[in-house]
Curated annotation (Swiss-Prot):
PROSITE patterns: AA_TRNA_LIGASE_I. The lineage of its organism: Bacteria, Pseudomonadati, Pseudomonadota, Gammaproteobacteria, Lysobacterales. A motif ('HIGH' region) lies at residues 59-69. It catalyses: tRNA(Ile) + L-isoleucine + ATP = L-isoleucyl-tRNA(Ile) + AMP + diphosphate. Belongs to the class-I aminoacyl-tRNA synthetase family. IleS type 1 subfamily. Pfam families: Anticodon_1, tRNA-synt_1, zf-FPG_IleRS. This is Isoleucine--tRNA ligase. Zn(2+) binds at C906, C909, C926, C929. It comes from Xanthomonas oryzae pv. oryzae (strain KACC10331 / KXO85). Binds 1 zinc ion per subunit. InterPro entries: aa-tRNA-synth_I_CS, aa-tRNA-synth_Ia, Anticodon_Ile_BEm, Ile-tRNA-ligase, Ile-tRNA-ligase_type1, Ile-tRNA_ligase, M/V/L/I-tRNA-synth_anticd-bd, Rossmann-like_a/b/a_fold.
Length: 943
């Protein structure tokens, strides 16, 4: 009867669960972290280390977090945690953007606009309460993601202290000469009733009318003469323009030409029976005339744009308004006619060229901009013939104007086109340029543009193309419109002279005095402030500004209002946001930082892509392809979500689907199972008593420590350059190849069959201990919950959380004089592969069942054979085969052959050995197993 030797084996045993059961375990861990004050402990533990500050770009305090939020916060968390392990003090202060239009809209839906049910102060209070509620909801979900930070003391742009610091930041901008006021065309949303910043604009397709309009020359003969032509009697001359905004024609004050463009004087369509010649850019003449129904291009002269400068035209429907021909750099021969109608109240370039020619001083505000904040023509807008424009909305006016121009002779062509057009990012409605009195941070007045472009060069951009992208945006951007005509925000707390409109000469001093009061009572203090308290007798000559600051200024000055305020260094080490923030937070922070300190507020900028489905489509409710982070955490757990984010190439669009999540769940299981196998074999191991020194280890164990050392160097470097996908790939490869397919398989024999305290067994356990200690650190920034769980099961004393530790210091490379070098192991592992290939057909044809049933012969050149023969007795353990013989042969190649063994099988270790039955007390055991049970035990040097 076969004796049961199971009790003599040391099989794996651990209480570390096979299943992660993350949706249940993670919330319990979160509760423990909160209870123990994990973040405060982390800060105390890191005290005195070098600082690494990742400054949080604030999400908007409105609505539930979505997948993009999760990507952003988890990427930040991975970096912060990896910096902790790298020996830094890495504080993380989360923040929220709390002012602005979306919150106003939410309150308006409930209470109506300001003045309906609530006065301005009550309205602001409701906004404050709403934002605070939204922060609480978002904070709960961010914590659930496993993101560690100062959640009890975040920064909020609605906090009185922040609002005060923002006003102090404005004082610095004013002090450095960057603030200006003027009537300039700005992006205007009629639904918001306010100016918009560049970052608040998004582009979408829109169908617009296109019209070609003729501007008749006041002196046709003089125009013809400029072309070297003589005008026949009764022939008129006109300059046609092409536009997609007919509603701007009432504000048309000039026509711009290109100075060096070539123009031709050509025969055009008759004007109500009268012959007419047209001035068109030569490159566009044929195409334009075709639109007007003229097939043949008959040219009467050539001229450069410079020859026509300051000649006068008539407005197409306001005959009394003379229209000068100006020269502008913005005019090209790409499309249209080469002549651009110029309405300085409705376009940046129009404004600049009109200002250059002194045109703005000739007209009143209502002529420059006849459109009010709702998009309606002012009462003073002159009619178009019998057609009343006053009170008409501009989007309706397009068709009305076109209809009214039929039959007047000036409408040469009309059509429609679909094109990309700026829309309000909140309302998704088309916006317009509209000249209004606004406050600006000038890009030129104190060299802000040049200084910002220089500062960009000092920053390390991830990916590298981010540098060219933001530089191009800064180089071409207009002045920053920082004023808004809204209620919920931080006031531009300036006093302006009632007659001159100039800010008070002591503005920076006054701003700081206002800030001190706001810090105590919030922004309402400004609106209730009696100017005489600060200005004394001068109060009668000054008005308080009621505009508020752009929310991008709110978030843009967090480097001052948060970092400096909390004693953290500036510039921050890293800003990390989505790729849209080159025109948003990265840029507003850069401009405010340079305006205040002549330096970028960050050393590094990292951007991530947007989330899309597996087909590359944007996720949306209408497509039904959206995946919410809350759902992932409920079904799979936060660590699966975190693993997907780490494994994705975040520099591009990040694809997610249920299938992708399933693959990441499978990857998680492989990593968890590896950890569990390590822990199972560390049962009964105490590093204080049993740890075998590296130099005394079995060489295979020493090799796996070497491989772990190589991997850790790779992982640490990848964390430092934010390449998390490489880390995940390297970890999975190490677990499946180095450990799963080789080391863990080979060492089972030693771990299970040797005496519990045998050196060979303790050597394997020591190697596994080193690997486990390193492994828990490697995964901690990504799989934070699992790492914390694993940390609690490791042998030895482990206090607190793995993040209190640093990268593991117990690993080391194989020394150059090792009995087996890394190169030796590479050759042996190649030989192992060769053996496996020889055994495969033997298994397939039934010659053997398992590799242990095959005896192996290796024939190699003399030198290689001499190197391997001392290992021959133990090679069977590396190959997990029967006995191995190494012979020398006169060949440069290595030959492997195998034959089924005839030796008996040991029932305990399953090896086929001639010594089975040699001990009558254990007739079914090999001599090695007998020694391991009752004798001194076997010795192992190599494997």
């Amino acid at each position: 009867m076969t004796q049961d030797y199971k009790a003599t084996l040391h099989l794996p045993a651990t209480e570390f669960p096979m299943r992660g059961d993350l949706p249940k375990r993670e919330p319990a861990m979160l509760e423990r972290w909160e209870r123990e004050g994990f973040y405060a402990q982390l800060r105390a533990n890191a005290a005195g280390r070098p600082l690494f500050v990742l400054h949080d770009g604030p999400p908007y305090a409105n609505g539930q977090i979505h997948l993009g939020h999760a990507v952003n916060k988890i990427l930040k968390d991975i970096i912060v945690k990896s910096k902790c392990l790298a020996g830094f003090d890495a504080p993380y202060i989360p923040g929220w953007d709390c002012h602005g239009l979306p919150i106003e809209i939410a309150i308006e839906k409930k209470y109506g606009k300001v003045g309906v049910k609530l006065d301005a102060a009550e309205f602001r209070q409701k906004c404050r309460e709403y934002a605070t509620e939204q922060i609480d909801l978002q904070r709960r979900d961010f914590k659930r993601l496993g993101v560690i930070g100062d959640w009890d003391n975040p920064y909020k742009t609605l906090d009185f202290r922040f609002e005060a610091n923002e006003i102090r930041a404005l004082a610095k901008v004013v002090d450095n000469g960057h603030l200006t006021r003027g009537v300039k065309p700005v992006h205007w949303c009629f639904d918001c009733g306010s100016a918009l910043a560049e970052a608040e604009i998004e582009y979408a397709d829109k169908v617009s009318p296109t019209v070609d309009i003729a501007y008749p020359a006041r002196d046709p003969g003089a125009v013809a003469a400029a072309f070297g032509a003589t005008l026949p009697g009764g022939v008129g001359v006109a300059v046609p323009i092409w536009t997609t905004t007919p509603w701007t024609l009432p504000a048309s004050l000039a026509v711009s030409l290109g100075a060096e463009l070539d123009y031709v004087l050509v025969e055009g369509p008759a004007d109500r029976g009268q012959p007419r010649w047209l001035v068109i850019a030569e490159a566009l003449a044929a195409k334009a005339l075709a639109r007007y129904g003229v097939d043949e291009v008959v040219v009467h002269g050539h001229a450069k744009g410079t020859a026509l400068e300051q000649m006068l035209l008539n407005h197409p429907f306001y005959a009394e308004r003379e229209i000068p021909l100006l020269l502008g750099d913005h005019v090209s021969a790409e499309d249209g006619t080469g002549a651009v109608h110029t309405a300085p109240g409705h376009g940046q370039e129009d404004y600049q060229v009109s200002k250059q020619y002194g045109l703005l001083e000739r007209y009143g505000a209502a002529q420059i901009n006849p459109v009010d904040g709702r998009g309606v023509y002012l009462p003073s807008t002159p009619p178009l013939g019998d057609t009343v424009l006053a009170g008409l909305h501009i989007w309706k006016a397009n068709d009305v104007i076109i209809e009214a121009l039929h039959g007047t002779g000036v409408l040469l062509a009309a059509s429609k086109m679909e094109h990309s057009y700026p829309h309000c990012w909140r309302h998704k409605t088309p916006i317009a340029f509209r000249a209004t009195p606004q406050w600006f941070i000038s890009m030129e007045q104190a060299n802000l543009r040049a200084d910002a472009l220089k500062a960009i060069e000092s920053v390390h951009w991830y990916p590298s193309w981010g540098q060219a992208r933001i530089a191009g945006m800064v180089d071409g951007r207009p002045d920053w419109t920082i004023s808004r005509q809204r209620t919920w925000g931080v006031p531009i707390a300036l006093f302006v002279h009632r007659e001159t409109g100039e800010p008070h000469p002591r503005s920076t001093e006054l701003l700081r005095q206002v800030a001190d009061r706001v810090e105590l009572g919030g922004v309402d203090v400004w609106y209730t402030l009696d100017a005489a308290e600060l200005l004394g007798d001068e109060a009668a000559d000054y008005d308080k500004i009621t505009d508020i600051l752009d929310v991008w200024f709110d978030s843009g000055v967090t480097h001052e209002a948060v970092l400096v305020d909390r004693g953290l260094p500036k510039p921050a080490d890293l800003y990390l946001e989505g790729s849209d923030q080159h025109r948003g937070w990265f840029q507003s922070s850069l401009l405010s930082g340079v305006a205040m300190d002549k330096a970028a507020p960050y050393k590094q900028c990292l951007t991530h892509g947007f989330t899309v489905d597996e087909h590359g489509r944007k996720m949306s409710k209408s497509l039904g392809n959206g995946i919410e982070p809350q759902d992932i955490m409920k079904t799979l757990g936060a660590d699966i979500l975190r693993l997907w984010i780490a494994s994705a190439d975040y520099s591009n669009e990040m694809s997610l689907s249920q299938e992708i999540l399933k693959r990441n769940a499978d990857a998680y299981r492989r990593l968890r199972n590896t950890a569990r196998f390590l822990l199972g074999n560390l049962h009964g191991f105490d590093p204080l008593q049993h740890l075998v020194a590296l130099e005394d280890m079995v060489l295979l164990d020493r090799w796996i420590v070497h491989r772990a050392h190589e991997l850790q160097e790779k992982i640490v470097a990848a964390y430092a350059r934010y390449d998390f996908a490489e880390i995940v790939q390297a970890l999975l490869n190490f677990c499946s190849v180095d450990l799963g397919s080789l080391y863990l398989d080979v060492t089972k024999d030693r771990l299970y069959t040797m005496a519990e305290d045998a050196r060979g067994r303790r050597s394997a356990q020591s190697a596994m201990y080193h690997v486990a200690e390193a492994f828990v650190r490697w995964i901690a920034p990504v799989m934070s919950f699992t790492a914390d769980e694993l940390w609690g099961y490791l042998p030895g004393k482990h206090v607190g959380n793995v993040l209190f530790a640093t990268w593991y210091g117990g690993l080391a490379p194989l020394p150059a004089d090792a009995a087996l070098t890394s190169a030796d192991f590479d050759k042996l592992l190649a030989l192992r592969e060769q053996v496996s290939k020889v055994l495969e057909p033997m298994r397939a044809n039934g010659a053997i069942g398992a590799a242990l049933e095959a005896e192996i012969t290796v024939a190699a050149d003399v030198q290689t054979a001499a190197r391997w023969q001392p290992l021959a007795e133990e090679l069977r353990f590396l190959f997990i085969s029967g006995d191995v013989t190494v012979t020398a042969a006169s060949t440069d190649d290595i030959f492997v052959s195998a034959q089924p063994t005839t030796k008996a099988k040991c029932v305990r270790c399953w090896h086929h050995q001639s010594s089975v039955g040699s001990d009558p007390r254990h007739p079914e055991l090999c001599s090695r197993c007998v020694s391991n049970i009752e004798g001194p035990g076997e010795e192992r040097r190599w494997f």
